[in-house]
């Protein structure tokens, strides 16, 4: 990381960057390759360039060790850990021997977890009724709930009436990474085998097409794609049922959508990018238990988004603040990170932060599509839970409780099928269709159905304010029972307009006290990857970023990425520019895979243990 930051701070880069800021965009004539230029090789990953055609891999032992389990779970977030714990609870209750293995790409459980987070404890209460006695880190009950609309200089308070989605009575402000870490301890105590630092890289299939399990990724590969002397093949984990709990926009779930056509009867998912910071503030300004949400400035009415500011009771005057931007925005000049930094200077926000110290930063994509965008959840040999398919209640700004409940229901359905000797599957991998049926009968489905029209109502000519009017009238009157369902308008990647049709956005320079630059922010995420490995941000075509994205959209990847992964720099020989991928900076948010207008970027897992090292984010 230090080497990377030094390189990005070099005079050549700063000079180029200064020119770019001044002009706001590169002249279109400068973005194309000259006739004498050669497109430089960017992607070296074996998912794009198969190793069986590479002489450097001749003679390398490619055998993989395999382990058998009853259930394999990919992802140690709230959903995956809920499923794992519930399976072992049922096994103990019924005196059954069920082996449950859970793999997590982060070096430690909770290190890749990021959320606001204001937690509805309903699912936690179901899973661990004695969570208080067990010491679950829910230290801050909500004591004050505020909502407002921001103009450039003012905050217009909006009352939160009982029954509206934003009401947080009975909820807790939590550091979700700490809660996930605690859940991991409970799961291990129940007998779950938890393997942090193992990144699931491949879905394995039986000959009949059902899911057989997963394989973790290979390690010990050079940046140019050649094997190191330390090369080790990944591990195979086989199971009767594999649960995919990867979180929002999981890279294995993407493969499963295509393989089993799981999205045939739902709308394309729509997403947001959430950026978050932790601050230690002046104790005189600290209001433990206060929850504050806003919409409006600095975003225009056609750009969905908003903010949160939570006062935690963690033994020190700590606040969690963040900003969410809907990834269906249209202006390629928009930078979610810089909108976040600008928001902190609002007269209603800045006084809270003055005299304080920023101690952490991170970002993660989130599902915003709601009920209309939930895919088919089961397939032979596996199923999807949590934020992977997307159970977030968008107007409530909460998805942890619904993710946990989906994991609980999946575990109960799997247990019934594993222990029912009269139930035979037509395929080798069990198809647990009962899970989707049970989910649709649960409070999760009822909750999501009630708010299904709120997010798409923001697509009107009035934008976000039209959505607020809709919520105030129709949700208040019908409580989600209106006899229609609004639709979203296509994929987020299709929403960008050409740069020539948009106005460049002038962002103020960060002051280093309230607002900050991108690289110093990434440094606070603890992000680190093995430098000498192929970039896990792979491109289907190395020429597309310059010939299409830069030429038409002024290179939006250099703005929508909240970690400075993508840069357009001058080519070493010839005219024009090339895309540079700083994979070491990646915080695993998945925004690039979602928003790339060419859908040319494919995010795959790096070596296990790499990525951010969040501490209670």
Curated annotation (Swiss-Prot):
The keyword Flavoprotein applies. A ubiquinone binds at residues 305-306. It is found in: Mitochondrion inner membrane. Its cofactor is [4Fe-4S] cluster; FAD. One of its GO terms (molecular function) is 4 iron, 4 sulfur cluster binding. Residues 577-606 form the 4Fe-4S ferredoxin-type domain. Binds 1 [4Fe-4S] cluster. The modification Phosphoserine is found at residue 551. Residues 1-33 form a transit peptide. GO terms for biological process: electron transport chain. Its main location: mitochondrion. Its EC number is 1.5.5.1. The modification N6-acetyllysine is found at residues 96, 132, 223, 357. Residues 109-130, 428-447 dip into the membrane without crossing it. FAD binds at residues 71-85. It catalyses: a ubiquinone + reduced [electron-transfer flavoprotein] = a ubiquinol + oxidized [electron-transfer flavoprotein] + H(+). [4Fe-4S] cluster binds at residues 561, 586, 589, 592. Keywords: 4Fe-4S, Acetylation, Electron transport, FAD, Flavoprotein, Iron, Iron-sulfur, Membrane, Metal-binding, Mitochondrion, Mitochondrion inner membrane, Oxidoreductase, Phosphoprotein, Transit peptide, Transport, Ubiquinone. GO terms for cellular component: mitochondrial inner membrane. It holds the Pfam family Fer4_ETF_QO. Belongs to the ETF-QO/FixC family. Accepts electrons from ETF and reduces ubiquinone. Monomer. This is Electron transfer flavoprotein-ubiquinone oxidoreductase, mitochondrial.
